[in-house]
């Protein structure tokens, strides 16, 4: 466990941070020699990372495995041994030069197939989503239909306020309201029927105020000719626009 932690710390500090800083200085100063040196190192270190990932799962049980990793990283980085430059020039450069065209073809095919694969997966995902949405809608509609069918006609008619206005049943007025309306043929004061052409005066609508006035009024009712003459002469009509105002005047009493 201790060996694993030490080897991991050495790889991170001396294998990645230190070369990264000197690569920055090579780019800043535009030193071609240093630039080429660190480019070769990063190519070799990328290959080392791939091999390390596989080896950690297979041969990590080998004695002194983590100590060998520390020694190999220092050998690659050391300016005295120049292990990265040696591995690149002796092995990697000839191998990559011979397989370069095939590697390029594989990369192009991988891009095309990857694009087609992504498009196919996208279409399948959209189809699955659409199918799920349609299925959910059909199930919900069926549930609503079954719920409505479960109601009986009595349950539907007991719901208040659901009927349209035109379909609501007519409710007749109570008999008390019908009887409370006065008959058009009866007079409000004496119960004497009037003809259609006769007009009611204000005195007839209000009724007499005493017994003497009632007797006088009855006497005037018996003499229709005298009433017609007196009321015709005694009434004054005042018009205000379209309104007709009739002046109240009490009938004269003759002895």
Curated annotation (Swiss-Prot):
Tagged with keyword Nuclease: no
Main localization (coarse): endoplasmic reticulum
Protein name, per record: Receptor expression-enhancing protein 3
Pfam family, one: TB2_DP1_HVA22
Amino acid composition bias (Polar residues), ranges on this chain: 222-231
Residue list for modification Phosphoserine: 210
One GO molecular-function entry: microtubule binding
Function: Microtubule-binding protein required to ensure proper cell division and nuclear envelope reassembly by sequestering the endoplasmic reticulum away from chromosomes during mitosis. Probably acts by clearing the endoplasmic reticulum membrane from metaphase chromosomes.
Keyword Repeat appears in the UniProt entry: no
A Gene Ontology term for the protein's cellular component: endoplasmic reticulum membrane
Tissue expression remark: Expressed in circumvallate papillae.
Species of provenance: Homo sapiens
Transmembrane segments: 1-21, 35-55, 59-79
Compartments, record wording: Endoplasmic reticulum membrane
């Amino acid at each position: 466990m201790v060996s694993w932690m030490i080897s991991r710390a050495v790889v991170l500090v001396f294998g990645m941070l230190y070369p990264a800083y000197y690569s920055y200085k090579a780019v800043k100063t535009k030193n071609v020699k240093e630039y080429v040196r660190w480019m070769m190192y990063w190519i070799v270190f990328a290959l080392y990372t791939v091999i390390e990932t596989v080896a950690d799962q297979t041969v990590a049980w080998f004695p002194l495995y983590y100590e060998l990793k520390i020694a190999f990283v220092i050998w690659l980085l050391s300016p005295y041994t120049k292990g990265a430059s040696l591995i690149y020039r002796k092995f990697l450069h000839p191998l990559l030069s011979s397989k370069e065209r095939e590697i390029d073809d594989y990369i192009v095919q991988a891009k095309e197939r990857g694009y087609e694969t992504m498009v196919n997966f996208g279409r399948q995902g959209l189809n699955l989503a659409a199918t799920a949405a349609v299925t959910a809608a059909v199930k919900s509609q069926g549930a609503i239909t079954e719920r409505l069918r479960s109601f009986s006609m009595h349950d539907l008619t007991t719901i208040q306020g659901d009927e349209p206005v035109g379909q609501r049943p007519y409710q007749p007025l109570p008999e008390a309201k019908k009887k409370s309306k006065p008959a058009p043929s009866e007079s409000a004061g004496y119960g004497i029927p009037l003809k259609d052409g006769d007009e009611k005066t204000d005195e007839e609508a209000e009724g007499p105020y005493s017994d003497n006035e009632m007797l006088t009024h009855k006497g005037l009712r018996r003499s229709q000719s005298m009433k017609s003459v007196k009321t015709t002469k005694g009434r004054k009509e005042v018009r205000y626009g379209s309104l007709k105002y009739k002046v109240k005047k009490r009938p004269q009493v003759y002895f």
